């Protein structure tokens, strides 16, 4: 009769690995989601993962000991309809359902529309969504917007009065999309209570990205979770 010999060290190692994986998986990630993309801009060629609306406006910089993707100036880009000017999209990747986590810092002056944007469902430069995180909410700021072959239109069911970007402060930001339910949720620092809630099913998949309507800022520590990602060449914008 064959005996199964167990080794406490093997069990301990397996248990430690399981704990490590659990610790590395943020709270709130749905079952069945895996890590589809991760970027901290430590790779010299990290910028090659993106397409941008103006290559001269974006660069990888080192700030306070960490690398980040920086929007350093207003893009020389004229959208066909009223929508953000400064856009950096993850190239050749199409996402449906997802949870996007990242760190954002706003480096511009303080005013009501001081913003950073998260882009999603981006199918063409005139067909996409974006979440606009701004200091003060109004019909054109701090909302979830759709660009559907006409100037952007807000459609969030719930928003806060705005966010406090502060000066030289990094913020944890999360964007969630459930295409079956049509739900869109945006979180800012507190990843348990959304600052924006919206519903729409117009664009069920598309590119993800970062930017600003007309300000400057940086993004780092990008992690995207989801059930799947489609590889498809992005046919628009510039490759740095």
Predicted segments, located by residue:
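Extracellular carbohydrate-recognition regions
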Residues: 24-55, 231-240
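Flexible glycan-contacting loops in extracellular carbohydrate-active proteins
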Residues: 195-223
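Extracellular beta-strand elements of beta-rich domains used
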Residues: 41, 102, 222-224
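Beta-strand-rich interaction surfaces with strong enrichment in secreted/lumenal proteins
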Residues: 26, 86-93, 158-165, 208-209
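Carbohydrate-binding surfaces in secreted/extracellular proteins
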Residues: 41, 166-197
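Short, aromatic/His-centered strand-loop micro-motif at the edge of beta-sheets
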Residues: 150-172
